[in-house]
């Protein structure tokens, strides 16, 4: 894990809805990978799907964000690996736990990221860290 950052977003439309900022994602990835050989890079993405009770608009926006990330990585010719939420959560004993439990677990494993995970709303970044760790510990051996 070379870094952890917030997903870049931008506001759009009259209602100032936030959406993923694709060009900024490209920039963030480009800056972080330029010193690495592409054969040594892995992009690990959570393989998510629609959730029960999620509205149509939310579902569409969620899928659009997922597609933007896949499209950027494809265009950059970066290898992508997908991990289902149940797999990585089971691995870290986080099934049926509070959302904040992943933040606590990530800090236990990577104390040097504690300043990046100090707020409750940083649980999404903690999830990303744990997904990367899960891949590294389970799938990387098969590469």
Write out the residue ranges for each language-model feature.
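Phosphate- and other anionic-substrate recognition elements at nucleic-acid/protein interfaces
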Residues: 1-143
């Amino acid at each position: 894990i070379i870094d952890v950052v917030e997903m870049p977003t931008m506001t759009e439309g009259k209602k100032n809805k936030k959406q993923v900022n694709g060009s900024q994602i490209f920039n963030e990835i480009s800056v972080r990978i330029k010193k690495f050989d592409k054969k040594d890079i892995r992009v690990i993405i959570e393989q998510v799907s629609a959730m029960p009770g999620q509205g149509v608009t939310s579902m569409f926006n969620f899928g659009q964000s997922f597609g933007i990330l896949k499209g950027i990585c494809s265009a950059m010719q970066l290898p992508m690996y997908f991990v289902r939420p149940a797999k990585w959560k089971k691995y870290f004993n986080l099934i049926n736990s509070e959302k904040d439990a992943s933040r606590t677990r990530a800090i236990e494993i990577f104390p040097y990221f504690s300043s990046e995970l100090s707020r409750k709303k940083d649980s999404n970044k903690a999830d990303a860290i744990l997904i990367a760790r899960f891949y590294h510990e389970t799938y990387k051996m098969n590469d």
